[in-house]
Structure formats: structure tokens, C-alpha cells
Amino acid sequence: DVHSGFAPRGARVEPGGPAYPFSLVERDRVLAPEVAQLYDQAVSSQWDATRDIPWSRVPALPAPLEAALGQAMTFLAENELAALYVPARFLSRVHPAYVETALFLATQLADEARHIDVFLKRARAGGGAPGVSATTTSRSLLSLLQTEDFTEAGFLLTVLGEGTFLDLLRFIEEHAPDEVTAEIVRRARADEARHVHFGLAHVRHALACDPGLFGRLEAAVRRRAATLAGVTSMPAPLADALTILAARGIDPPSVARGHEAVRELLHTMHEARIRRIVKAGFSVEQAEILSGLHTPNFM
């Protein structure tokens, strides 16, 4: 009831109250069974970007590695800004009767803010600077920000986008040039895994309650793919940065190994997306198609 305002669930509400502009009022589209448990996990897993990262141990890196790291951190921060702004658009639309979802989204915003903070700090901590913001990244993220449906946004951002980011963060952790970078992305990946779990629970529950949603989610993926039809690969500055991080240098044999590592990363991302889409409730055949349509920008 939009006339119950901010009354907690179970409270007795006097009649005659004003109508509130909550648009997310259908339980099946808002409150998945696991949300309360995920909120508790989120609260107990918060970490401090100042105290829990060993900033004093940031090393001096060779210039090519420093530049590559700055570029990677720039890309991560830019995408995490989108992951901050998109859920924020929906938080105030959630009816307070489903406060568990609102509370979880609040922890997600806190997580993303912390990630943005540490990624940008790491870009500068070794004497480097943020890198290039690619036009293709900007186009991809705008298409997320323009998504108006809560479940569609959850599927595009969380299941597909943040799910793909898990593999990117794991790759950067494996090839991190120092322990500080590895610790940053390890902690961020743990948070992102929780976000993906929430997204999967949300979409899976909504699909179980509304089979017609399968077609609408597929249509959302196809619309976004059409909007980004000219985006055929990850941004070149990011591809170069990941290659150099994996290569640990810029000599030709090392760069060749770095290229192969990035190629394997893209394959891993595709296969992992398929598994997550299947977990959400789609068939393997549908999942293969939807994964193939996902933005090369990763998020």
C-alpha cells in the first residue's frame, strides 16, 4: 500500500495518509528469499579502505607496469561508478515493506563507494595517474544507467556485468605486480560475489514467479546489444594494460604470453556467464546466446 509511507512492516497504519511514490511494490519482483541473509553477510563483511589495505607497502614499479596498473584501476573505478549509480536510482523506489532489499542495496552502494576509493588511490599511490576513459566504455555504461526496469537492470548490471567483473578481478589479482594490488582486488571480488549472488537470487525468484519475464530479459539484452552494435571489443587501452600486467614486461616474448592470457580471460568470461545465466533460470541454449550478446566492455 503506497499510503503506508515509511511505516515498518507489521506496524499499524492510521488511515488517510498521503500516497508515496514507491513503484517497486510487487513482492515477487523485489524480495527474493535470500535477501535478509545476504544483508547480514554484507554487514559482517565490511572492510576499511584505509586500515585494511597495506598502503605503506606500495612498491615502485617499472614505468610500463605503473601505467598499465593505472589504466586498469581507471577502468575498474569507472565501471564501479556505474555500479554505484544504477542501484541508487532504484533504492528510493523500493516499498519499505520490503526493507531487506533496500538495506541490501544500501550495503551494495557502500561497497561500490569503497571500491571506487581504493581503485583510484591505487592508480595514484605509486606515483602514477588515472588512464584513459574510452568512449566505448562510456556508451556501454550509459546504456545501463538508462535502464528503467529494476529486474532488467539487475540482470544486465549484476548477473551479466558484475558477474563478468568477477573474472576480470580474479585475472588482475593473479597477475598483480604487488601485494597491495592483489589485496585490493581480492577484497573487491569478495564484495562483488555477494552482489552477483543477490542479482541471481533476484532474477531467479522473479522468473519463477513470472515466466513471461524470460522474454523481456532477453529483449533487454538484445536492445542493449543493438545500441552498442559498434562496440566489438574491449577498449584498446584496457586490452593493452591487461596484456602488460599479465606479461610483467614489454619485451616481445612476454607480450605474446600476455596476449594469450587475455584471450583465455575472454573465453573464461564467456563460459562463466553462461553458467550464471543458467543458474538464473535460462536454458543452456538461451544462456549461450545471451552471453554472446553481452557487451565487450564487460559491464
Predicted regions and their residues:
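An internal, amphipathic alpha-helical element
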Residues: 166-175, 182, 194-212, 218-237
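Alpha-helical transition-metal enzyme core signature, strongest for iron centers
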Residues: 76-84, 105-123, 155-166, 188-199, ...
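Short, charged, amphipathic alpha-helical segments
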Residues: 102-106, 183-186, 215
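Active-site-proximal alpha-helical scaffolds that flank and shape metal-associated catalytic sites
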Residues: 121-193, 223
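Short hydrophobic/aromatic-rich motifs at helix boundaries and adjacent loops
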Residues: 56-63, 91-92, 112-113, 138-144, ...
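Terminal targeting/low-complexity segments that flank the catalytic cores of oxidoreductases
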Residues: 1-102, 124-130, 148-152, 209-299
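Short, glycine/acidic-rich beta->alpha junctions
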Residues: 97, 101-104, 111, 177
